[in-house]
């Protein structure tokens, strides 16, 4: 065994099973790439990303932990978001919530 190694049953694992999801189309209107990490509150991402922010309130990217999605300048792509879990309290990021969702 390697330190930190995970040994799972055979087959596929479904990430975030049973959690609410929403799909949004995102456009990078800026002149620089924007990278968003797996656990960043998507509602509060860089202002150069144009999308339905209210639909993203309380959601993050539905991707594996520790990974990210990069939005190139002028690029438009559709992403799936998954609801934040736990107490659903958000502090930090861009300071747009600072409390309970």
Curated annotation (Swiss-Prot):
GO biological process: urea catabolic process
GO CC field: urease complex
Organism: Paraburkholderia phymatum (strain DSM 17167 / CIP 108236 / LMG 21445 / STM815) (Burkholderia phymatum)
Gene3D superfamilies associated with the record: Urease, beta subunit (2.10.150.10)
Location(s), subcellular: Cytoplasm
First-listed, main subcellular location of the protein, grouped into a coarse class: cytoplasm
Alphabetical list of Pfam families matching this protein: Urease_beta
SUPFAM superfamilies xrefs: Urease, beta-subunit (SSF51278)
Top-level enzyme category: hydrolase
Top-level taxon of the source organism: Bacteria
Any one GO MF annotation of this record: urease activity
Catalyzed reactions: urea + 2 H2O + H(+) = hydrogencarbonate + 2 NH4(+)
EC number: 3.5.1.5
Alphabetic keyword roster: Cytoplasm, Hydrolase
Family recorded in the similarity comment: Belongs to the urease beta subunit family.
Protein name, as recorded: Urease subunit beta
Gene symbol of the encoding locus: ureB
Subunit note: Heterotrimer of UreA (gamma), UreB (beta) and UreC (alpha) subunits. Three heterotrimers associate to form the active enzyme.
Glycosyltransferase is among the record's keywords: no
InterPro entries recorded: Urease_beta-like, Urease_betasu_sf, Urease_subunit
Pathway where this protein functions: Nitrogen metabolism; urea degradation; CO(2) and NH(3) from urea (urease route): step 1/1
